[in-house]
Amino acid sequence: MMIVILYSMGTYISIKSTVNAFRYGIDPIPEWFDKISQRTKELDVMVDGHKVKALDIILENGILRAFYGYYIGMYPDDSIQVFRPEDFHSLYTLKI
């Protein structure tokens, strides 16, 4: 299983994880999710030969693609972090 962060320039960064993916039902729903949820779309993605659901979060200068089950946080310094849900270990920080 991977999270793929797609820059507008076309660079791919893969983060390997054994966890299934991004969940809508985060409680409480963070403010940043409300702000960007109108600019998202759901799509099917092939990962290691298996079709899975993914969510594209469209940012000003790129796309953050996350699988249901991960937590994603956006911070005041315009960075985005992707966390594993079981221990909130930060997998990756993306500066936007």
State what each model feature region is.
Residues N61-I96:
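Short, compact, well-ordered microdomains
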Residues M2-L59:
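N-terminal non-globular leader segments, chiefly Sec-dependent signal peptides
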